[in-house]
């Protein structure tokens, strides 16, 4: 089979591969930035939390979530409104504020879970919050059309991905520690690679897939990434 392999490459043949590599590198930077910013905001908020608030969280971990945790809904709802009414990412010349707006609600959701040591009800609420932000940021900016129509068209994939993420999270909460950690490492690696692939389509300005299965997979990846990052962050903060 070696005779079919080209031994000499022209510039025209190499350029498409270099462009593809550049797209993957750019997508990798975006993924790394979002992961780093989300975890950094969560950890910074946890360390800067006033002692009275920390004591309140300590008392509320074994019970229902403290009332303070519900304040984290304010900023994500505000970001959701701004992203629905504001410019999409591909039309905005300054993308850094929008990327930070994408990370901040996730960081607040992580912080809420860290504060509450969540009951199943709190976990469902946080998963729904992260999913709503993903829908607003990814759906509205990638589809490049009316955000309201985009969200209405994707309501079924979003509901199914929420159910899948909730079931996965509740199962992982009861998993054994060694299996738990190895599963999360594998999950994070797989999901990150899939997100890089999706972001490569985004950076190439390709059309968002209109079929049901790719859109469902995209949102399942995002919510699964949320779950995996939360558990890894919780293990790191409470490690002996």
Curated annotation (Swiss-Prot):
The keyword Phosphoprotein does not apply. One of its GO terms (cellular component) is membrane. It is a multi-pass membrane protein. Keywords: Late protein, Membrane, Transmembrane, Transmembrane helix. The chain crosses the membrane at residues 29-49, 64-84, 96-116, 123-143, 154-174, 176-196, 218-238. Disulfide bonds: none annotated. It is found in: Membrane. It comes from the Viruses. Its main location: membrane. Belongs to the cytomegalovirus US12 family. This is Transmembrane protein HWLF4. It comes from Human cytomegalovirus (strain AD169) (HHV-5). The gene is US19.
